[in-house]
Every structure is written in C-alpha cells, then in structure tokens.
Amino acid sequence: MNKPTTISFHVPPKMWSEFQESMLKSRMFNEEVIGFFFCQRHQVSKRKIRYIPKTWVVPSPDCYEHQSATGLVLTQPFHSFLLENYLRVGLDVVHIHTHAGRGMPDFSYIDDRYESEYAQFISSGFPQKPRLISGVFDEDFQSCQFRMWDRKGRKFEKVQFCNSLFEVATNENDMNNPDLMFARQKIFGEANQRLLNELKVALIGCGGIGSIFAELLGRLGVKNWVLVDPDRLETLNLNRMPGATQEMVEQRWHKVHYVKHLIKRIYSEGSCVKTIPTSIESELARQEIATCDLIVVATDNHFSRKMAQEIALEYMRPLVCLGTHIDMKQDHTPRMYCRVSVPPMGGGWCLMCGNIISLQRAAFESAPAEIHQMVGSVGYIEGVNDPAVFWLNSICASTGVGVIHGMVSGFLNVDSGIDWVYEFPGSDWRKTNTEYLRSDDCFFCC
C-alpha cells in the first residue's frame, strides 16, 4: 500500500503575524473575514509537497459585498483584481476565512459547495491550472483546519498548517518516551527537544567551522543531516577538526564522511546522515538541500555562499552563514573576526545585498582555472588560503548553534535577520543594524 502524500502550507512567523493582525483589524464585531495567500508549489520529494507563500492579501471592509457572522461575499471588482494579478502568474491560492465561536471549527455545507465550484473554476480558467487550498479558523485564530481540492472540485486532501520557521513531524512515541540523553535540556521544553530531534539540517562546508558546528548541534539533539563538501581531509586540517586523525588523511577520507563519523559517534542508531562529496553546484546537492528544514553554509569561499543563499531564497528555507577572518596589523598584532549572519526569511535583505558576499569574488571562484591564474597574477585574488585557528572557529560555530537553538525554541527573534561580528583581542560582539542591510533593488531577494 502506497504511503499518502504529505501536503503542508508553511508561513514564516513574521508574515503570519502580519496577516493575522490584518485579518483581525478587518472586522468590527464578530463578522467572518477572509484573506488570501498566493503560493509557490515546492515538490520536496515524491510524497511531500510544500506550499510557500509569495505574498498575501486581506480585503478591506469596502471589498465586501456582504459581511456578517454567518457568511461573506466579495465584490466582483476586487475578486477580478485578485485573479488578474496573482493567479495569472502561476501561483496557487490559499484562502482562509473565520467562523464565529471558539474551538475547532468545521467547514460548513456552504463552504463545501462554494469551494468545490471555485476549485473547478480556477483550474479551468487559467493555463497554469492553479490549485485551491482552503483554511477555516475560529474567531480567535487559535484552532484551524486546512484542505486542498482537486482540480475537478470533487474531493480534497488534508493539509498540514505550519506557522513557524521549521516544519517537522510529531512522533507520538517520542512524546511518550523522552530521551534520557537530553534530560538536562528539559528546561527548554520537551516540544523543543522533539523539534531538534526531527530537524533536518543541510550543512554546506564540512571543514574547520562546519565540523565543530556539526559536533555541537548534534549533541544538542539534531540527528538528520545532509552534508555537502567536495574536499578530502589533509594534514593541514588536523589542527582544527575535532577527532580527525592522520590515518584518516592517509586513507583520503572525504570531509563529509569524517563529519558523518562525528555524528554517528553521538548516535549509534536513530540518526540519518546523507553525504554528498561534491560541490553545491551539483543537481544532487541542490535537490537534497531543498528537502531540508534549515540551511547552514560554513565555507571559505563566496561562490558557495552565493549558491546557498539562492537556494534558501528559492525554497524559502532559513539560512545561517558562518565565517571567520584573521589578518595582521602593521605592528604585527593580529585582528581576528568571526561572523554569524541570518537573513530574514520573509525578504528584506540577503547575503548579497547586505555585502556579506562579494559577487566579484564569487565570479572569480566559479571561473575556469586559467581565469584564476590570470586574475591572481594581477593581484585580484590571493593564492593562499586565509589563516585559521581552532578556538576562533569554535566561537563562530558555537554561536551559530546558539542562534539556531534560539530560533527553534523561540527565545531569539530573527524576523528582521541578524548579523553579528565578534572581534578579538577586543572581545567585542558587534550587532549590525540590519536596517542598513536592506536594499530595495537587490536582484536576488526583492
């Protein structure tokens, strides 16, 4: 018997909060209200579909022909506006309305009839054949149901609604049998621990920062990984990669297999680690990264960061970028930095428009070998890798893990994104005002 397809409607928390507030403001008493999300369909896997909103609309009171506690009707001009501006560009529609009362609401007979006709209408009236997802909430927006109609409007499937950064399944057995390994993390809540245990993380770059990061996040409870890195272990890596040995170097271990070894030392069973010993450019890497709940890039080049950011933007996945830098001042004293950046998922700024990635350097790094030699000879890029030390990488990696823990637990607000820079020997954390990272004309995120 085939497993059923899992369909989820995923809304970033900032977008959901704004939508919910706008819905509540659009009624005077306890009238029903309606709002719309226009979504991109993302086929995560053969049996998993995710709907990601690109924009939302809540009609103002003058957009209703009729509005009461028992029903509502939109004006024809407003409805035509929605069709022309959103459905014709190939987006699917999620329409959400409220019912009076508190507790789990049910779809009414009128809902069934209207939605069945509407699902058939939009799929036959537009070349892209958009799908209709409908949701009903109680008047306080505390309880809800969602469903997706087929294109003929004859039957529907259940849709999971998720209004957090992360979307994971709930395993009833895990709820009843908490893992003693994490007993001293109970202060953060059992639901938070289950979320960490189910979280699927893509790690791009399994070197000095990435390996420490994987060890730390793994011990926090993350068991599901996709590891991407084309490189093999070398002797010069041994000073900053925990548990790496000369024997691994001599056996020419790929870094992804070394990091998998670190995770499997923590979890002899119950973990799932996919290793992809290629660059992020490969189609296999891209497909696997797109299935993850969170993308972390810990590489030492701009091109891979650019690719990771583009994937995160396309599939609306949270992205965490980790990096360090060391240079020497004229008096031969070192300046050391680490940087942790999390662009906002709902848009506003990305690593490119925030100048966290140099597109010029990314272009050089993706160029053929002969171009590298040419630009190197005229001083555009250096031929020696940046210096690195274990303890600075550890500060960066552990801060990144702390940020993710805060994102999962809800005690760190990243709606506007964060960009933190640590400087040593001053031992200062500088927190960028992300308003200055915003760009209205960024080609990538606007």
Which residue ranges define each predicted feature?
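A short, basic/flexible loop-to-alpha-helix module at the beginning of a structural domain
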Residues: N171-V201
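Glycine-rich phosphate-binding loop and adjoining beta1-alpha1-beta2 segment
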Residues: N224-S268
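Glycine-rich phosphate/adenylate-binding loop
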Residues: S124-G125, D138-R151, E167-E172, L195, ...
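Short glycine/serine/threonine-rich phosphate/pyrophosphate-binding segments
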Residues: I209-A214, T235, H302-M307
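A structured beta-alpha segment of the ubiquitous adenosine-cofactor-binding alpha/beta core
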Residues: V256-L294, T299-R305
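A short helix->loop->beta-strand "cap" motif at the edges of active sites that frequently abuts
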Residues: K129-R131, E269-G270, Y315-R317
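Conserved beta-strand-loop surface patch within small alpha/beta domains used
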Residues: M1-V94, A100-A169
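Glycine-rich adenosine-cofactor-binding loop
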Residues: G189-R232
